[in-house]
């Protein structure tokens, strides 16, 4: 075990000491024009942010903050350590956003170095950056499996755990102190990682810092799996891949090496199952195996011990579920997925004798979760808790074209995202709710009734709510109208979707604290 720890420390040896001079010295111009970042053609995870968060702006803000502190010292006897105050929220927010940019530099440099010389491979696999590419992976690899481990990755509720994980990769005492300061100032520890419920300025106004900390924590969690798999060369997997996308990276790893450690101290056993798949997006991961309930229970025990002893997080029983793929649904990326056995009857005749043969065809089914979607529409004030459409009073002062365009965009995005559903009936119901809500919003604005309003505009009003997706497919296949209609009734995965829809993301990064 000590030998593995030594190798792990060597793998983490690429540490940087430039955060302190970057913040408080004049070397900022050198790093701001670093050739390694500028020459990269790989789209990094959090690229394209506002120039207000640039490192040069942060340096100027720090200088202005120190000037204000010195002036306050000469003006009156005040405490210069009161950095975050009611009047200084703008300065603290700007510095924290700039700090997020700065701490991403070493990880971006490592990513550029790792992907150097692989631009052609990344260009070929550009479509795999889409989160919809996960579902064809499910269809190709999960249809012959039986058991699924549904895992909700916990998040540490103590700030020192985050600082300790970050300390493995960045060797700079000043930046660690600054990170600890931001964590203690901004986090509401009673509702950690619940930005939609927390009143914290950090969680609502600095999502970049939040995503960086979350991804670094998950990266630390997953690095143990990949490190032990690479070290066990005699059990090396046949194929593996790591794919990056713009929100958070996920991995599709085949033939994982199973690692079971007893209290992470004494003994280490390595064994491998020939059919094992792992997929993760944000805080939820799926581990699938074929007809091995004992193996899945060992994985569950291993994960609980990993969280408890390495991350000091007490795992609740509801975070890990062992489900049968053909009996239970997998709630992943806004879809309910499971395996399904379809019986196909084949008539075979030999001379004068005829036989009926039942063939069980295994398929992977994806459906729309109608109840969570109605809950999201209820929170957005498009319908009530029973799914009955209501008007949108906040848009009553807008023009008719604006109201119709807003409803059409929402309906188009939901149809686009749920185009891979096996059953379109639930999607039709969502479209109906949005259509009637749009009509009621217009009726409320014009102080009329639904019957009079539709009679004046005609029965063909807002038919695009139901024909928009079919129209898009007809543009893709202009010479085959029948093909486009058949695809519309079937499942279509769009590989240009790189993030989950707000109405689909029912959790929205929410992880209940332990």
UniProtKB/Swiss-Prot annotation:
One Gene Ontology molecular-function label: RNA binding
InterPro entries assigned to the protein according to its UniProt record, in alphabetical order: Domain_X, Maturase_MatK, Maturase_MatK_N
Disulfide bonds: none
Protein keywords: Chloroplast, mRNA processing, Plastid, RNA-binding, tRNA processing
Subcellular location: Plastid, Chloroplast
Main localization category: plastid
GO cellular component: chloroplast
Pfam families in alphabetical order: Intron_maturas2 (PF01348), MatK_N (PF01824)
RNA-binding listed as a keyword: yes
GO biological process entries: mRNA processing; RNA splicing; tRNA processing
Role summary: Usually encoded in the trnK tRNA gene intron. Probably assists in splicing its own and other chloroplast group II introns.
Protein family: Belongs to the intron maturase 2 family. MatK subfamily.
Name used for this protein in its record: Maturase K
Organism encoding this protein: Acer palmatum
Underlying gene: matK
């Amino acid at each position: 075990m000590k030998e593995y720890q030594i190798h792990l420390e060597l793998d983490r040896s690429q540490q940087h000491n430039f955060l302190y001079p970057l913040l408080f010295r004049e070397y900022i111009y050198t790093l701001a024009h670093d050739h390694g970042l500028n020459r990269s053609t790989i789209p990094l995870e959090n690229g394209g942010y506002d120039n207000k968060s640039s490192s040069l702006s942060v340096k100027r803000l720090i200088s202005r903050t120190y000037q204000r502190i010195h002036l306050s010292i000469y003006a009156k006897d005040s405490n210069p350590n009161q950095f975050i105050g009611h009047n200084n929220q703008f300065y603290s927010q700007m510095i924290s956003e700039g700090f997020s940019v700065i701490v991403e530099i070493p990880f971006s440099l490592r990513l550029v170095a790792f992907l150097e010389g692989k631009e052609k491979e990344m260009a070929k696999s550009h479509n795999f950056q889409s989160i919809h590419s996960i579902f064809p992976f499910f269809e190709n690899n999960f249809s012959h499996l039986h058991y699924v481990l549904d895992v909700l990755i916990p998040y540490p509720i103590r700030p020192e755990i985050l600082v300790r994980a970050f300390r493995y990769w960045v060797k700079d005492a000043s930046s660690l102190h600054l990170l600890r300061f931001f964590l203690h100032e901004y986090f509401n520890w009673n509702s950690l990682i619940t930005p939609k419920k927390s009143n914290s300025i950090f969680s609502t106004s600095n999502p970049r810092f939040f995503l960086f900390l979350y991804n670094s924590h998950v990266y630390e969690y997953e690095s143990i799996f990949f490190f032990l798999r690479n070290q066990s060369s005699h059990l090396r997997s046949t194929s593996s891949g790591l794919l990056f996308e713009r929100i958070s990276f996920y991995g599709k790893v085949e033939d994982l090496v199973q690692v079971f450690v007893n209290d992470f101290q004494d003994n280490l056993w390595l064994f491998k199952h020939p059919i094992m798949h792992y997929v993760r997006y944000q805080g939820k991961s799926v581990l699938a195996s074929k007809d091995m309930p004992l193996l899945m229970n060992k994985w569950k025990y291993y994960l609980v011990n990993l969280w408890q002893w390495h991350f000091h997080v007490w795992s609740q029983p509801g975070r890990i579920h062992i489900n049968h793929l053909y009996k239970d649904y997998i709630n992943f990326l806004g879809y309910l997925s499971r395996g399904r056995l379809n019986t196909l009857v084949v008539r075979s005749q030999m001379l004068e004798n005829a036989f009926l043969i039942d063939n069980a065809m295994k398929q992977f089914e994806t459906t729309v979760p109608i109840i969570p979607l109605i809950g999201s529409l209820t929170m957005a004030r498009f319908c009530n808790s029973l799914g009955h459409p209501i008007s949108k009073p906040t848009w009553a002062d807008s023009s008719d074209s604006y109201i119709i365009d807003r409803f059409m965009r929402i309906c188009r995005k939901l149809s686009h995202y749920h185009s891979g559903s096996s059953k379109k009936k639930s999607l039709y119901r969502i479209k109906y709710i949005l259509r009637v809500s749009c009509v009621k919003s217009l009726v409320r604005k014009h102080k009329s009734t639904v019957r009079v309003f539709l009679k004046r505009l005609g029965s063909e009003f807002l038919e695009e709510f139901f024909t928009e997706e079919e129209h898009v497919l007809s543009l893709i296949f202009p010479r085959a109208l029948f093909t486009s209609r058949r695809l519309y009734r079937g499942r279509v995965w769009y590989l240009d979707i790189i993030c989950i829809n707000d109405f689909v993301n029912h959790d929205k990064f929410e992880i209940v604290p332990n």
